[in-house]
């Protein structure tokens, strides 16, 4: 899969040009009438969104998601409260806009010309391609002419418009079903489960779901990269639109947009079927032996992250030993183990307790200037290569005019720690920075797989329990709506 990157220079230039074009009509700074003044008088910015692993979901810690965080920041920027209206169906989003129940749609929607008669778009904040998906083990189609079976897409999605264009221009015999009951994510899951032959999805959602459904396979790209944008009601004044342009320009300039992309999309890289399949198998067969220990000693972090670290270190093998002498589930060196009070590195409980304590000590060293949700990545890189080399990575980032408190900036410098043109200038010298980079990225992917896979098992178990309970009641089973949140 293509690495997802935002063209921040292009976004900045386009935003500036649009702002200049709109400048004579901008009323929001003076607060004189218009849609923005209505929002400020109301004290609320109302957004309609979709429940999904990327856009908006809820956890024990509260709401989360890329679009939620962007919208929350926009509401704060405007000085109002954010009100979120979640939906399952895309058509409901645009109904909210038409009925003035929402001020904007923040739902990870692809730019689509068919929607422009009802709404206008905001700036792009990342891009995706539309892809045809099939189940691994079945025949891979090379074009739509090779499709033999049922193709379904979500009603109201950009995929419907894409298929209509293809039918008109290239494939007159192309047919599909537009489902109003199932979301794009649910259709992808049906393909993974063998209940549907094909569907279209966006490259980000597909990449996320492959972490828990490795049998999902991409046949081919249906479109080139397309922008993902917010939508506003067409026909209103430009005050809210102009404020949005200014907000996005600021987000690009201060690096916030890059940080959010890193948080939600940074782990979406190349997909390894064998590695993912092996990991998911280990979740069922090996993890139950150690789960209670991970839960017991993961005090400052999610136990699933601690488990992901251990898998990256040893593949959950308590007897693991490397040629350099590191040993055990958490692969501790003798010196580190002595400093942590670990007597037997091959004892699973001692190893997990020691590794968790070592990680806590590293997290305590991370400067307070580093954002709370990024501190763990600095700590993990240091866990792999040592705290001194992490200081060097921050130093090099600052030397190159980057932000030493931003993980997206610092991680780009990690591979440079092994390059002769850089490491002689640094305090702690040569380091295997590329290994540290891959180490953190792998752990992030394992964590995503673990969280998603366990939630999927819980969802299926709840569904089966509901169906069994309803079998004797004389009415159809109702599938509970349990969102898959990464």
From Swiss-Prot:
The keyword ATP-binding does not apply. One of its GO terms (cellular component) is cell outer membrane. Gene3D superfamilies: 1.10.530.10, Periplasmic binding protein-like II. Its EC number is 4.2.2.n1. It catalyses: Exolytic cleavage of the (1->4)-beta-glycosidic linkage between N-acetylmuramic acid (MurNAc) and N-acetylglucosamine (GlcNAc) residues in peptidoglycan, from either the reducing or the non-reducing ends of the peptidoglycan chains, with concomitant formation of a 1,6-anhydrobond in the MurNAc residue. It comes from the Bacteria. Its main location: membrane. CDD domains: MLTF-like (cd13403), PBP2_YfhD_N (cd01009). One of its GO terms (biological process) is peptidoglycan catabolic process. The active site is at 313. Residues 22-268 are annotated as: Non-LT domain. SMART domains: PBPb (SM00062). One of its GO terms (molecular function) is peptidoglycan lytic transglycosylase activity. Keywords: Cell outer membrane, Cell wall biogenesis/degradation, Lyase, Membrane, Signal. Residues 269-486 are annotated as: LT domain. Residues 1-21 form the signal peptide. The keyword Phosphoprotein does not apply. It is a peripheral membrane protein. InterPro entries: Lysozyme-like_dom_sf, MltF, Solute-binding_3/MltF_N, Transglyc_AS, Transglycosylase_SLT_dom_1. It is found in: Cell outer membrane. The N-terminal domain does not have lytic activity and probably modulates enzymatic activity. The C-terminal domain is the catalytic active domain. In the N-terminal section; belongs to the bacterial solute-binding protein 3 family. Murein-degrading enzyme that degrades murein glycan strands and insoluble, high-molecular weight murein sacculi, with the concomitant formation of a 1,6-anhydromuramoyl product. Lytic transglycosylases (LTs) play an integral role in the metabolism of the peptidoglycan (PG) sacculus. Their lytic action creates space within the PG sacculus to allow for its expansion as well as for the insertion of various structures such as secretion systems and flagella. This is Membrane-bound lytic murein transglycosylase F. It comes from Serratia proteamaculans (strain 568).
């Amino acid at each position: 899969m293509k690495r997802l990157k935002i063209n921040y220079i292009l976004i900045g230039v386009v935003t500036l040009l649009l702002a200049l074009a709109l400048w004579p009509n901008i009323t929001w700074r003076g607060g004189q009438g218009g849609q923005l003044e209505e929002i400020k008088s109301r004290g609320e910015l109302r957004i309609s969104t979709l429940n999904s692993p990327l856009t908006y979901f809820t956890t024990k810690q509260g709401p989360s998601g890329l679009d939620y965080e962007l919208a929350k920041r926009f509401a704060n920027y405007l000085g109002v409260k954010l009100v979120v209206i979640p939906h399952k169906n895309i058509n409901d989003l645009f109904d909210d806009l038409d009925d003035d129940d929402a001020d904007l749609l923040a739902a990870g929607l692809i730019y689509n010309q068919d929607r422009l008669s009802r709404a206008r778009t905001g700036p792009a904040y990342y891009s995706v391609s539309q892809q045809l998906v099939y189940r691994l083990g079945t025949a891979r189609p090379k074009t739509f002419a090779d499709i033999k079976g049922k193709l379904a897409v979500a009603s109201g999605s950009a995929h419907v418009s894409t298929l209509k264009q293809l039918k008109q221009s290239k494939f007159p015999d192309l047919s599909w079903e537009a489902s109003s009951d199932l979301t794009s994510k649910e259709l992808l899951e049906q393909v993974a489960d063998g209940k549907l032959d094909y569907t279209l999805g966006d490259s980000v959602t597909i990449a996320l779901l492959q972490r828990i459904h490795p049998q999902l396979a991409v046949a081919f790209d249906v479109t080139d990269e397309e922008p993902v944008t917010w939508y506003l009601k067409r026909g209103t004044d430009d005050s809210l639109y102009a404020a949005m342009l200014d907000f996005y320009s600021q987000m690009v300039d201060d690096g916030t947009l890059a940080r959010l992309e890193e948080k939600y999309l940074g782990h979406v890289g190349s997909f390894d079927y064998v590695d993912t399949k092996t990991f998911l198998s280990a979740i069922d067969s090996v993890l139950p032996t150690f789960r209670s220990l991970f839960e017991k000693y993961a005090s400052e972090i999610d136990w699933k992250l601690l488990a992901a670290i251990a898998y990256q270190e040893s593949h959950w093998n308590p007897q693991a030993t490397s040629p350099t002498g590191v040993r055990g589930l958490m692969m501790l060196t003798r010196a580190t183990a002595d400093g942590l009070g670990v007597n037997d590195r091959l004892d699973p409980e001692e190893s997990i307790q020691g590794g968790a304590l070592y990680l806590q000590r590293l997290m305590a060293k991370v400067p307070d200037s580093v954002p709370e949700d990024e501190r763990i990545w600095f700590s993990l890189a240091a866990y792999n290569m040592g705290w001194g080399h992490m200081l060097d990575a921050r130093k090099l980032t600052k030397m190159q005019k980057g932000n030493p408190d931003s993980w997206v900036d610092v991680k780009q410098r990690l591979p440079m720690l092994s390059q002769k043109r850089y490491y002689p200038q640094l305090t702690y010298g040569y380091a295997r920075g590329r290994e540290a980079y891959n180490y953190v990225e792998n752990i992030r992917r394992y964590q995503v797989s673990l969280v998603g896979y366990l939630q999927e098992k819980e969802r299926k178990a709840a569904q089966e329990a509901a169906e069994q309970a309803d079998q004797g009641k004389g009415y159809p089973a109702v599938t509970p709506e349990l969102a898959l949140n990464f």
